[in-house]
């Protein structure tokens, strides 16, 4: 096989392995992992969830072809002071949340940690309000504690 750039022979394994390692830097997932890009630039700093204080309620218009005002909240994270927008799931879920409430947010579940569906620029969703899950509040199983 003339013209092949790969070394051949009994003792070529080290050279072949190093060559593979060099090429793995062109893979996006490898580069993100090795340079710890998620931990550096993610507002949650690589954690699955984070606590924050609600600054304001906002309505976000959905992308084409849908037409709706999706309810969301602006949240300031406790651990680093960064401000993110978090979607409030469920019918009437925003009614359980007031300004200055403490909420727990998690990723919304979009591809590669990005936004999901017709919500532009929203990467997080609200999971808990004042220590009570939003799901329990909808179903009427628990009352929201007064802080």
Curated annotation (Swiss-Prot):
Molecular function terms from GO: rRNA binding; structural constituent of ribosome
Keyword RNA-binding: yes
Superkingdom of origin: Archaea
Keywords: Ribonucleoprotein, Ribosomal protein, RNA-binding, rRNA-binding
Membrane spanning residue stretches: none
GO CC annotations on file: small ribosomal subunit
Assembly behavior: Part of the 30S ribosomal subunit.
Function: With S4 and S5 plays an important role in translational accuracy. Located at the interface of the 30S and 50S subunits.
Family: Belongs to the universal ribosomal protein uS12 family.
Record-given protein name: Small ribosomal subunit protein uS12
UniProt organism field: Sulfolobus acidocaldarius (strain ATCC 33909 / DSM 639 / JCM 8929 / NBRC 15157 / NCIMB 11770)
């Amino acid at each position: 096989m003339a013209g092949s750039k790969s070394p051949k022979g009994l003792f070529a394994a080290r050279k072949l392995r190093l060559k593979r390692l060099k090429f793995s830097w062109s893979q996006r997932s490898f580069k993100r992992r090795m340079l710890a890009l998620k931990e550096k630039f993610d507002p949650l700093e690589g954690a699955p969830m984070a606590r924050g204080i609600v600054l304001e309620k906002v309505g976000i218009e959905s992308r084409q072809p849908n037409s709706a005002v999706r309810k969301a909240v602006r949240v300031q994270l406790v651990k680093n002071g960064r401000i993110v927008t978090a979607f409030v799931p469920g019918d009437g879920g925003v009614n359980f949340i007031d300004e200055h409430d403490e909420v727990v947010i998690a990723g919304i579940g979009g591809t590669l940690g990005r936004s999901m569906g017709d919500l532009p620029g929203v990467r997080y969703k609200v999971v808990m309000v004042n220590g009570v899950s939003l799901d329990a509040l909808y179903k009427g199983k628990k009352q929201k504690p007064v802080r």
